[in-house]
Curated annotation (Swiss-Prot):
Protein's cellular compartments: Cell inner membrane
Family classification: Belongs to the PsbN family.
Transmembrane segment boundaries: 7-27
Membrane-protein topology: Single-pass membrane protein
Protein name: Protein PsbN
Pfam families noted in UniProt: PsbN
Physiological role: May play a role in photosystem I and II biogenesis.
A GO CC annotation given for this chain: plasma membrane
Source organism (scientific name): Gloeobacter violaceus (strain ATCC 29082 / PCC 7421)
InterPro entries: PSII_PsbN (IPR003398)
Keywords, comma-separated and alphabetical: Cell inner membrane, Cell membrane, Membrane, Transmembrane, Transmembrane helix
The keyword Transferase appears for this protein: no
């Protein structure tokens, strides 16, 4: 592999990991700690 291919693969792996972490945070067990500001707002 050339240096450019290693660089591109590294960036793609980083993007996949960031996306997986975001989905886990949004829908996994940590989502129980997230607050909904619209539910807390009084009209």
């Amino acid at each position: 592999m050339t240096v450019a291919q290693v660089f591109v693969v590294g960036i793609l792996v980083a993007l996949v990991l960031i996306t997986a972490f975001a989905v886990y945070t949004a829908f996994g067990p940590p989502s129980k700690k997230l607050a909904d500001p619209f539910e807390m707002h009084e009209d």
